[in-house]
A protein has these predicted regions:
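N-terminal non-catalytic cap/leader segment that marks the start of a structured domain
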Residues: 1-97, 267
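A generic local secondary-structure boundary/capping motif
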Residues: 4, 65-67, 88-90, 114-123, ...
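Catalytic-pocket segment enriched in acidic/His residues
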Residues: 5, 58-60, 85, 91, ...
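Residue-level "contact hotspot" at macromolecular interaction interfaces
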Residues: 68, 122-124, 235, 259-260
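Structural signature of FAD isoalloxazine-binding scaffolds in flavoprotein oxidoreductases
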Residues: 93-110, 125, 261-272
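RNA pseudouridine synthases
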Residues: 130-136, 140-155, 161
Length: 284
C-alpha cells in the first residue's frame, strides 16, 4: 500500500492512497479516517481494508504533496553509509554508524521547492532511502527490527558543503538543516510491499541526467543494524524518520564540483518506492 499526505479543500492535512498521478482520500473509504499523525495506529489488516470500490473515488494528484510525516519526533540521518560513497570521498569505512540529525523545518513534500540559502554557494544533492518507524522501539535486536518499520519513502538529504565541512570545527548539523533541506515523498510504501529493502536501486537525476546510481546492497550498516544501534541510545517512536545514507556521485566529489542552482530539478527515484521531484529556487 502507498500512502501520501495532502491538504484537503479546507486546508487540513489528510491521508490518501497514492498512485502516480492520482490519490484516493482515506476519508472517502472510511467513516473514521486517521487524524494527522495517527496512521501508525492502523494495523496491517485495517490498512488492507481501505480499498476503493469505484475508480471515481480517485482524484487527480495535487501539484504539491505534504511531507509523508508532518511532525516527526526525530529526523535521524546516517552519513557515509554506502561503501562506494565512502570510497569516493576518500573516507575510511566507518566502524559504527555516523549519526546526525535535521530539524523538522527541513521537511517539505513532493513538488515543493528547495530553497537555496544566500549564505551558501555549495548546496549538494543526496538521494536516500528513508525508513518510517511505525512502532515504539528501544533496545531492539536486529532480528526484530523490521517489526518496528511502518514503511519506506524517498528522501533528499540536501547539504550545504561549505557549512558542513568548511566552518570551524565542522558544522554537520547546520550544513544539513537549512529550511527545506529534507524533501520526502511522494508516499510511504508500507513495509509489506517492499520485499527486500537491502537490494533497492537508488538514483538521483539532476535536470534529467542520472548523477547517482547504486543499490542499497552497498549499505555498510543495513536497516536492521541501524535500528539495533540507534535503539541502544534513543527510543524510536511512530513517525520517526531514518535517512539511511547516500550513494556515490554527489556534486562535491565531481571534478569540477557540481552544486545546485536556482531552476535545477532534482528527482530521487527508488525502486519499488517512487520518485520524489523538487525544484530549486533562490531563498528570499
Amino acid at each position: 500500500m502507498s500512502l501520501c499526505r495532502y491538504l484537503d479543500e479546507q486546508g487540513q492535512p489528510q491521508y490518501a492512497l497514492y498512485r502516480p498521478g492520482a490519490i484516493c482520500p482515506l476519508k472517502n473509504l472510511t467513516d473514521e479516517p486517521p487524524a494527522d499523525g495517527q496512521i501508525f495506529s492502523f494495523d496491517a489488516a485495517r490498512l488492507a481494508s481501505l480499498q476503493p470500490t469505484d475508480e471515481a473515488q480517485w482524484i487527480s494528484e495535487p501539484s504539491h504533496l505534504l511531507p509523508v510525516v508532518g511532525q516527526p519526533g526525530k529526523v535521524i540521518c546516517i552519513g557515509l553509509n554506502y561503501r562506494d560513497h565512502a570510497i569516493e570521498t576518500g573516507a575510511e569505512i566507518p566502524s559504527e554508524p555516523v549519526v546526525f540529525s535535521k530539524f523538522n523545518t527541513t521537511l517539505v513534500g513532493h513538488g515543493d521547492s528547495i530553497r537555496l540559502p544566500a549564505v551558501s554557494s555549495e548546496v549538494d544533492y543526496e538521494a536516500e532511502l528513508v525508513v518510517v518507524i511505525g512502532k515504539k522501539a528501544k533496545h531492539v535486536s536486529a532480528a526484530a527490527a523490521m517489526d518496528h518499520v511502518f514503511g519506506f519513502t524517498c528522501g533528499h538529504d540536501v547539504s550545504a558543503r561549505d557549512w558542513q565541512k568548511g566552518r570551524p570545527g565542522g558544522q554537520w548539523l547546520l550544513g544539513k538543516t537549512f529550511d527545506t533541506f529534507a524533501p520526502t515523498g511522494p508516499c510511504i510504501v508500507t513495509s509489506s510491499e517492499v520485499s527486500d529493502p537491502s537490494n533497492l536501486r537508488v538514483r538521483m537525476r539532476l535536470n534529467g541526467e542520472v548523477v547517482q546510481d547504486s543499490t542499497t546492497a552497498q549499505l555498510i550498516f543495513d536497516i536492521p543494524s541501524l535500528i539495533e544501534h540507534l535503539t541502544k541510545i534513543v527510543t524510536l517512536l511512530p513517525g520517526d524518520l531514518i535517512f539511511t545514507g547516500t550513494p556515490p556521485g554527489v556534486g562535491a566529489a565531481r571534478n569540477p564540483p557540481v552544486f545546485l542552482q536556482p531552476g535545477d530539478e532534482c528527482e530521487v527515484e527508488i525502486e519499488g518506492v517512487g520518485t520524489l521531484v523538487n525544484r530549486c529556487i533562490a531563498d528570499q
